[in-house]
Amino acid sequence: MEQKTFCYNCGNYGHIFKNCHYPIISLGIICYHKLNDEYKFILVRRKDTLGYTDFIRGKYLLNKDSILNLVNIMTIKEKENILKYDLKKLWDELWTISKDEHIDEFEKSKEKLDIIRNNGIEEQNNGIKEQLKLVDIVKLSNTKYQDPEWGFPKGKREKDENNLEGSIREFEEETNLNKDHYKLLNLKPVIENYIGSNTKKYRHIYYIAKLLPEVKIELSENNIFQKTELSSIQLMSYEDVVENIRPYNKEKLAVLESVIETLKYLDEHKIDL
């Protein structure tokens, strides 16, 4: 029997990821805990920023705006690192245990980095040509982030997974929880749509779950995924989320506000899902 082509992005059959017309999709769970009439939500902080990750992978065009878009997302330390260290060191620290899976990207990324570090790229400034090197572009960045982005646990689907299956697996990998620690609510998932700094369209699909009592939220030394992908995990109130979410993540806050309104309605009407 002929095996059907599976799209790892949308989960449909008949085409592959690069031919998918949907936004780039991630799947996850927004999990809440209620204590003293206050809702708190599980958020995770990445090990590296999205801008830094895309830069190390060479996911940019050889022009100022494309590179600066990524640099502006980076932490202060990441900006220092891309100027200070060779790509091999940065690459190995980024991927840790899975670096061989992305080795095909390494040479292309190294070629780009050599160009912008050594030769620079030609840009027009008020009609005058100038050569900008990476160090010049980093100097143009005025962001001063200390930590990588916070967000809800999520990730990409695996082979033959539907939305719910992928959401559960990603959530459990990132939180180190299992089905005995939370209860999925019988609600339609909430959708977060946005356009990234790379001008691509993204869609995050979140199911809603309730954290069961007495469950601890913490990083585990025995969880390889957490050790290599995350730098922190916390239960946050809405005010905490507002304080920690980056200013350009307005869509994420809108999704959270929608979830809170739904939870309040369920509580007020004593609806148990």
Task: Locate predicted features.
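Short amphipathic alpha-helices and their capping/turn residues within compact interaction modules
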Residues: N12-H15, K34, N176, D180, ...
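Conserved Nudix-box catalytic region and its N-terminal flanking loop in Nudix hydrolases
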Residues: Y39-R169, E173
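Extended hydrophobic secondary-structure segments that form protein cores and membrane-embedded regions
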Residues: F41-K47, L187-V190, Y206-I208
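Short beta-strand scaffold segments in enzyme catalytic cores
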Residues: L27-C31
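Extreme N-terminal segments of fungal proteins
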Residues: P23, N36-E38
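A short coil-to-beta-strand element that immediately follows conserved catalytic motifs
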Residues: N178-P189
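A short, cysteine/histidine-rich metal-binding "knuckle" motif
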Residues: M1-I25
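Nudix hydrolase/Nudix homology domain
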Residues: N9, K18, V71, L83, ...
